């Protein structure tokens, strides 16, 4: 989180703005996914630059439910499994990918409108 000092009247307050948020779950079912989607939306309403990840061992949500259009940036299913009874190994490549995404985000320039104007594409 990034600490921000705000002043309201004569009073100064320090607030924390999330830069990266990671929810960790042993398994992810539909109810937990819905809660994570709501949390991601709340966090991103305060800081749209925040990355929001869910990390779970197994993904136990029906295949008809697709969270791709939610505010969650990625769901990492470390065992690449939909069944918590199977003991597939945790995939270390996924952990490294998550680490690198967080590291790159923390070191990135969040806003470069002038550079985007030069490219001709303002949003992406």
Predicted regions span which residues?
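Conserved catalytic cores of phosphodiester-cleaving nucleases, focusing on short active-site segments
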Residues: 1, 17-26, 36
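Active-site-adjacent loop/helix micro-motif of nuclease/hydrolase catalytic cores
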Residues: 6, 27-38, 45
């Amino acid at each position: 989180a990034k600490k921000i000092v705000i002043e309201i009247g004569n009073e100064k307050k320090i607030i924390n703005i999330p830069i990266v948020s990671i929810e960790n779950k042993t398994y992810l079912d539909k109810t937990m996914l819905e809660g994570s989607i709501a949390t991601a939306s709340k966090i991103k309403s305060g800081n749209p630059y925040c990355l929001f990840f869910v990390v779970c061992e197994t993904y136990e949500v029906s295949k008809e439910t697709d969270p791709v259009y939610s505010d969650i940036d990625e769901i990492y299913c470390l065992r690449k499994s939909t069944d918590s009874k199977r003991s597939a190994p945790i995939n270390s490549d996924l952990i490294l990918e998550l680490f690198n995404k967080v590291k790159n985000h923390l070191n990135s320039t969040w806003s470069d409108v002038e550079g985007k104007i030069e490219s001709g594409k303002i949003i992406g």
